[in-house]
Amino acid sequence: MAKKVAGQLKLQVKAGSANPSPPIGPALGQRGINIMEFCKAFNAATQEMEKGMPIPVVITYYQDKSFTFAMKQPPVSYWLKKEAKITSGSKTPGKGPKAGTLTKAQIKTIAEAKMKDLNAADIEGAMAMIEGSARAMGLEVVG
């Protein structure tokens, strides 16, 4: 018989840096999930990734206090900032100076990496979504 699902929890955790301090500890603890067990499993699963990369994770926890988790790709904003070599987007997107520039080739690379997490039918649709995110961050898309 399958385990009875008690709920799901969505967190964004830095790769290789899961520890019991906030926000992870309280979020898991109040649901009765073994915090250290999650931290060890998550850190082991992300040890090959770039340390500090934000990873969205969906934790499904069961009534017997066990859990499973699924990791997604880092957010689009992370990829955009990395490709444009900036630390943050523009404070006034669309008005003031541009925070940086990206090429269509860079947008396509990001779209291919994020395709399975995006709600897009094809690569062109995914690129359009990512270009919109780039413009919202004050980045200019050229080429």
UniProtKB/Swiss-Prot annotation:
One or more lysine residues are methylated. The keyword RNA-binding applies. GO terms for cellular component: cytosolic large ribosomal subunit. CDD domains: Ribosomal_L11 (cd00349). It holds the Pfam family Ribosomal_L11. The keyword Glycoprotein does not apply. Forms part of the ribosomal stalk which helps the ribosome interact with GTP-bound translation factors. HAMAP family: Ribosomal_uL11. This is Large ribosomal subunit protein uL11. It comes from Rhizobium etli (strain CIAT 652).
